[in-house]
UniProtKB/Swiss-Prot annotation:
Residues 1-40 form a transit peptide. InterPro entries: CRS1/CFM2/CFM3, RNA-binding_CRM, YhbY-like_sf. More expressed in leaves than in roots. Optimum pH is 7-7.5. It holds the Pfam family CRS1_YhbY. Optimum temperature is 25-30 degrees Celsius. One of its GO terms (biological process) is regulation of translation. It is found in: Plastid, Chloroplast stroma. It comes from Zea mays (Maize). PROSITE patterns: CRM. This is Chloroplastic group IIA intron splicing facilitator CRS1, chloroplastic. Residues 448-473, 502-550 form a coiled coil. The keyword Ribonucleoprotein applies. PANTHER family: CHLOROPLASTIC GROUP IIA INTRON SPLICING FACILITATOR CRS1, CHLOROPLASTIC, CRS1 / YHBY (CRM) DOMAIN-CONTAINING PROTEIN.
Amino acid sequence: MAPPPLPLFSPSLKAPPPPPWLHGSSTQSRDSAPPVPPLPAEATPSKFRIDSPKPAPARKNTKTAAKPLTAGVPGGRTHRAVLGIIRRVRSLELSDAPSPNSVHTSNSGAAAAAFHLTIELSPPREPGQYVVEKEKSRAVPWAAARDEGLKVALRREKKPREPTRAETELETHELRRLRRLARGIGRWARAKKAGVTDEVVKEVRREWASGEELAAVRIVEPLRRSMDRAREILEIKTGGLVVWTKGDMHFVYRGSKYQQNAKHSHTFLTNVHKDDAFQENDQSICGQKDEEPVKGTLYEREVNRLLDTLGPRFVDWWWDTPLPVDADLLPEFVPGSKTPYRLCPPGVRPTLADEELTYLRKLARLLPTHFALGRNTRLQGLAAAILKLWEKSLIAKIAVKIGIQNTNNEQMAWNLKHLTGGTVILRNKDFIILYRGKDFLPGGVAQTVIQREAQVHDEQVKEEEARLKAVDSLQMVGELSEESSLGTFREYQGFHAKFVHENTENSNTMIELEAEKYRLEKELKDHEWKLSVLNKKIERSNQALAKLHSSWSPSEQSADREHLTEEEKIMFRRIGRKMDGLVLLGRRGIFDGVIEEIHQHWKHKEVVKVITKQNQTRQIMYAASLLEVETGGILIAVEKLTTSHAIILYRGKNYRRPAKSSFSNLLTKREALRRSIEVQRRGSMKYFVRERQKSILELKRKLRYVTRQIRYRTP
């Protein structure tokens, strides 16, 4: 249970007396304390000061006003919660009983180091005394400075940047000299979409051979997305050091030990050492590298170890590590390769449902890329690597290389699907994602299942041979009678008369007619069922429209109408045609918002022009008459425009703006939209009902014709 509230202004157990100005003319306060002169209004805290009847206007800039420590935080703790925290902190401070020495020394200056929390408490009030508080007023002039010291700014901790190879290997003055030299370079090699290719490496070395210490390389998409990865690739392939990066430019230093006439080997472009191309994070159990820290998480090390077993890595990968396997370096043909054996578990549907497909696509988004592919055919080596990967992972994620000509992701996906038997769950210009399928069997399990099925087949063959031998060994109990027709010509004649028609052409025609009759009957039944479904939908739509129409009651036209002369109608018609302001009658039709907008136009103008996109004359005239009745105006004309019609309405000479702004007898905007959707839906369903009825009549006609043909050919 929390301790009772204690004053937080002093570390002593005895509460200090309240300020004398809070007790007014009390005798007890005069006896207990000497008279204190009243404080000026500027020094009196706003919490304790009685404001004048006309308070000063509040400042507009409330950002500089100091808030008390116990004020509620928007979206955080409330005032009561902060008070509870302070009580607990205060109880911890008072839990240790102070010794006499400590109390004595506290008066000499140690009390300044005690833990104090300033909190604004409501002062005690006497009967008849009231305090007028301002909501957004500062407490005292020094409150802002006092609260400023209590604020604690927690900055986001920045991740320390790892130094580059050039920063660790070169001296500081040498690095500065090279960067100053790089600012004057005007030529550069361009690493295109294919990345840092052999041509780029040759151009960099050609620049070094000409006597230059630095060579500039401009990086383009997609390698520009990760300039750190581009720097690593350049340092691996060229053997130099990237001393400076500016925008999309890398400046490569040839090194202090560069030999101009040395022959450089290009074998590392296809077989890069593992320590340079990617970091192998697993440690030796024997203890040779115990002093080196383990880099990367367990998942990253397992992924790297798995990809190492599949093939060489793709060094020009434009994303972060782990580097995918270069599928173009895998063998094109594998001897004895074939589509793997598959077997779906009993009671499991082999196809994927929509929810499963969505889940697999979301799962593939987080997985690293396993392969990078740049050719369309000869993918047997890649298929074998995918089958090996599927033993550890459900999904194989393949990236299509950028910058290689004649790549066709559709052909790649088709070949991989037929070589592996998997399911393509995603295919676009960047990625191909293959799911191993529910019927996938790992290599060892597949061989076991095949062997077991072969054993079962052999046992069945042996059982059949044994059964045939037993049947042959049995002797017939009775001989065939002389009157038997088995195997005789009479048996052949009876079979021919019973089952074979005399006219073969006629029998084939009858079979075709029977098949056509069966097809027509089935199709007619399907059409009738679909027609019944459409009729039920139309009935539900009619019920929804009836419910909407029940909440709408059109107004009655007034009997006392104004009459305009022909000259006035012609004048208002010209004015309406030249007007720029208009009211657009959309798909919702006429609802309360349209009537309100018309009255807003009539507030300043006598004529309003309403534009409607309807095509049928009956609908246009109905809308014009309904607007005339609901607004109380006078219909001047209905004009034909280029792609629409204009309805011109005059407000009348005795026009008065309606008292109420909402029209309860009309539909709201939301109800009008629902009505429009239901009307459009019902119209489309009626169209399909007519088309379905025509199809049913045509099928019945064909069925009658086929039935007559069968009846005519039947003997």
